[in-house]
Amino acid sequence: MSEHNPYGTMHGTTIITVRKGGMVVMAGDGQVSLGQTVMKGNARKVRRIGKGEVIAGFAGATADAFTLLERLEKKLEQYPGQLMRAAVELAKDWRTDKYLRNLEAMMLVADKTVTLAITGNGDVLEPEHGTIAIGSGGNYALAAALALMDTEKSAEEVARKAMKIAADICVYTNENVLVETLESAN
């Protein structure tokens, strides 16, 4: 049981970002589980923020993730067009603020130039190959996507196939996948 949630740990999601062929794609499943129960199958965990120039996806406690998304949007207003700077400033706040420190979530964010994972430990990580995944099925999705990167598949096809594979393996991930895309500068 989580110290913040008397019903047990909230599980369930897989979020992946794939950067390939001039596109950046973020995909996430719709399942929200509480303990061993599926609470919702069509949650929207991937969305556009920052005037539509940034895509963001989250894993973890939903209310916590929304709090962090709101904070990131404020940082993007403060540092327009500077996703890396906004993410680092959010991570600093997350790590040092007494209230934020207790939030249980992780985020992937991407714009036309950079993809980042932001964690509650204050980490801002840029993936080595432009592909990264988080959540309960994240490792399965990441392995599948990396295996598909040298194929003729588009970034969206790679992301969708990786999500399908993760959903086949991870009980906390479903096949109700939402995808957001942006043109990539690299």
Curated annotation (Swiss-Prot):
Subcellular localization(s) per the UniProt record: Cytoplasm
SUPFAM superfamilies, A to Z: N-terminal nucleophile aminohydrolases (Ntn hydrolases)
Pfam families: Proteasome
Active-site annotation: T13
GO biological process annotation, one example: proteolysis involved in protein catabolic process
Binding residues annotated for Na(+), in chain numbering: A167, C170, T173
Reactions that this protein is recorded to catalyse: ATP-dependent cleavage of peptide bonds with broad specificity
Keywords: Allosteric enzyme, Cytoplasm, Hydrolase, Metal-binding, Protease, Sodium, Stress response, Threonine protease
GO cellular component, one term: HslUV protease complex
Known EC number: 3.4.25.2
GO molecular function, one term: metal ion binding
Broad class of the protein's primary localization: cytoplasm
Protein activity control: Allosterically activated by HslU binding.
InterPro entries tied to this protein: ATP-dep_Prtase_HsIV_su, Ntn_hydrolases_N, Proteasome_sua/b, Proteasome_suB-type
Functional note: Protease subunit of a proteasome-like degradation complex believed to be a general protein degrading machinery.
Oligomeric and partner information: A double ring-shaped homohexamer of HslV is capped on each side by a ring-shaped HslU homohexamer. The assembly of the HslU/HslV complex is dependent on binding of ATP.
NCBIfam families from the UniProt entry: ATP_dep_HslV (TIGR03692), PRK05456.1 (NF003964)
Name assigned to this protein: ATP-dependent protease subunit HslV
